[in-house]
Swiss-Prot record:
Protein family (similarity comment): Belongs to the bacterial ribosomal protein bL33 family.
UniProt superkingdom: Bacteria
Keyword Ribonucleoprotein: yes
InterPro entries, per database record: Ribosomal_bL33, Ribosomal_bL33_sf, Ribosomal_zn-bd
Alphabetized HAMAP family for the sequence: Ribosomal_bL33 (MF_00294)
Example of a GO MF term: structural constituent of ribosome
Keywords: Ribonucleoprotein, Ribosomal protein
GO BP, one annotated term: translation
Provenance organism: Buchnera aphidicola subsp. Acyrthosiphon pisum (strain Tuc7)
NCBIfam families found in the cross-reference section: PRK00595.1, rpmG_bact
Protein name: Large ribosomal subunit protein bL33
GO CC terms in record: cytosolic large ribosomal subunit
């Protein structure tokens, strides 16, 4: 059986609010950790979100 190319990841807020987004990424095309600027509704600002594992 073939291994899945896409992996589920959690994008965790760098502000420490505990807010996160879930998404998928292709681990073959982007082996590095993902960093995206997204909206944090807790502090009502756009901030950096870092990739984390889903447990």
């Amino acid at each position: 059986m073939a291994k899945k190319a896409r992996e589920k990841i959690k994008m965790i807020s760098s502000a420490g609010t505990g807010h996160y987004y879930t998404t998928t990424k292709n681990k073959r095309n982007t082996p590095d950790k993902l960093k995206l600027k997204k909206y944090d509704p807790v502090i009502r600002k756009h901030i950096l979100y870092n990739e984390g594992k889903i447990k």
